[in-house]
Amino acid sequence: MDSQRNLLVIALLFVSFMIWQAWEQDKNPQPQTQQTTQTTTTAAGSAADQGVPASGQGKMITVKTDVLDLTINTRGGDVEQALLPAYPKELGSNEPFQLLETTPQFIYQAQSGLTGRDGPDNPANGPRPLYNVEKEAFVLADGQNELQVPMTYTDAAGNTFTKTFVFKRGDYAVNVNYSVQNAGEKPLEVSTFGQLKQSVNLPPHRDTGSSNFALHTFRGAAYSTPDEKYEKYKFDTIADNENLNVSSKGGWVAMLQQYFATAWIPRNDGTNNFYTANLGNGIVAIGYKAQPVLVQPGQTGAMTSTLWVGPEIQDKMAAVAPHLDLTVDYGWLWFISQPLFKLLKWIHSFVGNWGFSIIIITFIVRGIMYPLTKAQYTSMAKMRMLQPKIQAMRERLGDDKQRQSQEMMALYKAEKVNPLGGCFPLIIQMPIFLALYYMLMGSIELRHAPFALWIHDLSAQDPYYILPILMGVTMFFIQKMSPTTVTDPMQQKIMTFMPVIFTVFFLWFPSGLVLYYIVSNLVTIIQQQLIYRGLEKRGLHSREKKKS
C-alpha cells in the first residue's frame, strides 16, 4: 500500500459517501420505536383526526421586531408569514429570507390554539375562533425589550379565551400564552396544540439547491422526547400515511431545512401527544396536543407554549429546549461535528473571519492527526522495502496462490509489518473529514460569510471555480511527490486522472469545504516531507522516486 493507492482508497470512500447521501435522500426510513413510542398508520391522515381544525380566512395583522417580521391570521391566530430581516434571501439582496409562507404555490404555517372538548379550535364547536385585536400592526419600538400581542375571543356561552404572543428583542423564540376565563357553571376542558404544516414539493423560488449530490441536507420533520433525543421524520413517510403517534412528557416537534427551523415546544408538566398527518393536496403536518386541562367555573386557567421560528443558532436553541440544537443537520457524525463547530466558533471570536478560522482549524485537526499520518507513511515505507522480497517470492512460487499467501504472511510477521497498517490510519481519519463536511454544510454562521478576494460566501460554490482547481493542483503535487509501486496500467491511469476527477466533484462544493481541503492538502505536503526525512535516516525511504 502506498500514497497513490491511498488516493484510490480515498476516492472509493468518497464515492461511497456520495452514494450513501443519495440513498439517504431517496429512501423512506421507518422511525425507530422505543418503549414509550408507537408509530401508527392512519388512513385519513388529516389534522381533524387529531382534533386540530383546518384554518380559515380572517384579518391579517403584522408583528415586527428587530429579528422577526410576522403575519398572523386572526382566524385561529396562526402565523402564516415569517420573514427574517437579519438574513437576506440571497447574497447582496435587500429582500429578507422568508421562512413561513402562505401562497397558492407554497404553504408553510405555524398553527396553534386550544382544542379539547370545550376548546374554541375543536372542529365540533364550529369554525375556528375569530380573535379580536386592538390594532393591525405591532412594532417593537427602540428601547423596548418585549412586545405583547394579545388576541381575545368570547364564545356564545360568555367564556373568554385570550391568546397572547410574547416577543423579546433579539429572540427567535416566541412564547404563546393562553388564558381561559370560565364564565359558565361547568368545568371547561381544553388542550393546547401546536402544528407545523408545509407543502411537500418545493416551488422554484423556494428551492435553494441544497438537494443536489454535493449539497444534500435534510428537509423534513423531527421530534424529541426524553427517550429519543432527536428523531427525523421524512415528509415522504408522512405523505405515505405512515404517521407518528408518540405520548411523552416534555420534548418538541419541528420542521427543518438547511440553516433554518420551526419548532413547537409545549410548556407543561403533563403528557403531550406528538403526531404527524397527511393533510392532502401535497401538504403534511407535525404537531403536538397537550394533556387536557380543567378550568373550574369562575376560575381562569393559564397555559403556554413556545414557537421557534428562525435560524438554527445552536446555543440559542439549546437554551430554549433540551436537544433543540440537534436540529442543525450534522448527520450521523454530530458527536464529532458539534465539538468541531464549537472550536471553529471559538477561533472565530479571535480572528473575526470564518475563512481564516477554517484554515486554523485545519492546521489544528491535521496536527492532532499527525501521529496517525506518520504511522500510515511508516507502514507504507516498510511495505515498499519488502517489495523486492515479495516479487522474488512470487516468481519462485509461480501460480501457487496458497503458498504465496502463507509465505507472505510469514514474511510480514518476521519483518514486523502490518499489511493493513497503511489503511487503518486513513480509515480512522475519514469520520473526522466527514464530520467537517457536515459542520461546514449545516452551520448558519457560514451562510453568506465572506472570506477574501472573490469568495463572498463560504457556503456557496466558488463562482469562478478557482478553489476547486487549486485543490486539484495540490492533489497532483501530492501524487507526484509520493513513492509508488503501482505497476498495473489500469491503476496508473486511474491515479493520473484522480486529481481531475476530484476537481470536477468539488466544482459544486461550498467554498468553505474546498478551502479546508486545499489547506489540508498543503499540510499533507509539509508533513509528507518531514516524515520522509525521518524515514530516510532509518533507511526506509529514498528521495529518488521509483519509475513504474
From Swiss-Prot:
Regions that span the bilayer: 6-26, 350-370, 424-444, 458-478, 499-519
Localization of this protein: Cell inner membrane
Claim: tRNA processing is one of the keywords in the record: no
Region named Disordered: 28-56
Membrane topology annotation: Multi-pass membrane protein
CDD domains in the record: 5TM_YidC_Alb3, EcYidC-like_peri
Bias (Low complexity): 29-42
Keywords on record: Cell inner membrane, Cell membrane, Chaperone, Membrane, Protein transport, Transmembrane, Transmembrane helix, Transport
Domain of life: Bacteria
Gene3D superfamilies found in the cross-reference section: 2.70.98.90
GO terms (BP aspect): protein insertion into membrane; protein transport
Pfam families: 60KD_IMP (PF02096), YidC_periplas (PF14849)
Record bears the keyword Methyltransferase: no
One MF annotation (Gene Ontology) recorded for this entry: membrane insertase activity
Annotated Gene Ontology cellular component terms: plasma membrane
Family: Belongs to the OXA1/ALB3/YidC family. Type 1 subfamily.
HAMAP family: YidC_type1
Subunit structure: Interacts with the Sec translocase complex via SecD. Specifically interacts with transmembrane segments of nascent integral membrane proteins during membrane integration.
Function summary: Required for the insertion and/or proper folding and/or complex formation of integral membrane proteins into the membrane. Involved in integration of membrane proteins that insert both dependently and independently of the Sec translocase complex, as well as at least some lipoproteins. Aids folding of multispanning membrane proteins.
PANTHER family, A to Z: CYTOCHROME C OXIDASE ASSEMBLY PROTEIN COX18, MITOCHONDRIAL (PTHR12428:SF65), OXA1 (PTHR12428)
Protein name: Membrane protein insertase YidC
Name of the gene encoding the protein in the UniProt record: yidC
